[in-house]
Amino acid sequence: MFNKSYLKKNLTYFLEIYKNRPIKNNKSGMKIDHCFALYCLLKKIKPKYIIESGVWKGQTTWLLKKVLKNSKVFSIDIDFSNREVIYDDVKYLNKDITQYNWNKLDKNKTLIVFDDHVCFSKRLNFLKKNKFKHIIFDDNLPNHHIGYYTPKMIYERQYLIKKEFIKYSNIYRSFKFIIRYFNNEFANNVKFNFNFKFIKITYSIKVNKNLKKNFDTFRNKIKIYYEFPPIIKFNYKKRFEKVLTNFNESISHSYNVKKPIFNMNEIKLSEELTKELNAQYSNICYINLN
């Protein structure tokens, strides 16, 4: 969708906007890599309507309004308690995206931005029924790195292997695990690894005919599947530092990421922005459906 020269040129324009972002520390929200991806995709697609599923503090809403001032934005979240940025002309909705009637929107001119941490397999029937064409998915991680299905997994024909980590220091979760364990609530093929600081649970693959059918149908409708590249070379250790440090996970050598936009010696950013690079990159993607 984009060549490198276009992306390099547009990063300069983006940074002029991004330096004035309202939330400097957007922990758990979009940072520089994904905000730049969203910026470029918005300028490319130019939707008339934008449905933002997952608001958090409102940084993404701010970027949507900044890039496309005349687009109608619907911002959805079941919990607005963390919101810091609010607009009078944005329609805020507090139920799941599936609970609203979107029939009046021109689907060819409507973009959905999914950043709600909901399994993408649960969105397929909704997308099919409503005939949405343009989708951006934020947390598009591959297998072994997230606890639910993402477009990347479905596109690459991966079936979810779910992992769960429970620290003994988390009394509530540890107690809940003990109850589940002694009530035989885990399937026989679930694997347990009892570390001295935590428990690692690896669940078996669950595939049924309906799930496979939905995945096949979705793949057949894809016209474009595009993963936006990281700004600089992907740093696996930096991105997954918490899991690697706290749960002794090994580095995955099968984690495929697109080639970066810049070499390290080609770009100079402030210390603040440099810290954001790779800190949240999750293979953000754009999907265009038939």
Where do the protein language model's features map onto the residues?
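A short alpha-helical cap/connector motif
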Residues: 1-111, 118-290
